[in-house]
């Protein structure tokens, strides 16, 4: 099965004339590159409950079942819900989210004078994602509605409905996220770096940064 898995992966990441067929990052699996390509249900549950880092629970928020039998889909949903609705210490959670964000930015930020890194820049896509993920992990224990969706747009809406985000914050983050994603898609199609001129997104950056500071740094 290991050989079969690697063969499937090789097909999926084939580069065509139109670009990469499908982007896959298997480093995010349990135990990273040293872990098995596929885990049993019980092994996956045990890892998520006992060994996973906070950033892995952040990733689990976006996880969804893609293909397979209904029984496995149902079991995955049960495990995901059980992990994400755990009661968490807000101070410790905030500290870990901030540390991971700083670590990512220090290694992945693409810097060029006059340009803004759509994904990793201060006030960019990842900051919005981390705000959403912090909100879900902090509140899912009391608000199961946060476990229904996996996409950021509907999660922003749900975070607004439970009172975590104000109307203006939800609207601003939604608009910024969609603007960033649109620009990112255009860059991908042109096979260009995912960067734009600072002045093109300055108002979005200021909004996202202010929400980050209020909800994460000073929360």
What residue ranges belong to the model's regions?
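A nucleotide- and high-energy phosphate-metabolite-utilizing enzyme signature
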Residues: 1-219
């Amino acid at each position: 099965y290991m050989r079969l898995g690697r063969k499937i992966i090789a097909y999926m990441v084939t580069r065509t004339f139109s670009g990469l067929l499908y982007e896959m990052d298997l480093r995010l699996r349990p135990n990273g590159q040293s872990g098995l390509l596929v885990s049993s249900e019980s092994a996956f549950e045990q890892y998520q409950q006992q060994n996973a880092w906070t950033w892995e629970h952040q990733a689990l928020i976006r996880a969804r079942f893609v293909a397979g039998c209904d029984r496995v889909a149902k079991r995955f949903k049960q495990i995901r819900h059980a992990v994400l609705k755990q009661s968490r210490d807000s101070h410790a959670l905030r500290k870990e989210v901030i540390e991971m964000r700083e670590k990512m930015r220090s290694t992945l930020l693409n810097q060029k004078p006059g340009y803004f890194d759509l994904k990793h820049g201060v006030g960019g896509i990842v900051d919005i994602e981390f705000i959403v993920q912090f909100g879900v992990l902090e509140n899912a224990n009391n608000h199961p509605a946060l476990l229904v969706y996996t996409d950021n747009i509907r999660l922003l809406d749900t975070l607004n409905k439970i009172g975590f985000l104000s109307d203006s914050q939800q609207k601003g983050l939604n608009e910024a996220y969609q603007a960033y994603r649109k620009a990112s898609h255009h860059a991908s199609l042109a096979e260009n770096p995912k960067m734009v001129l600072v002045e093109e997104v300055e108002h979005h950056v200021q909004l996202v940064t202010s929400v980050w500071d209020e909800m994460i740094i000073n929360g």
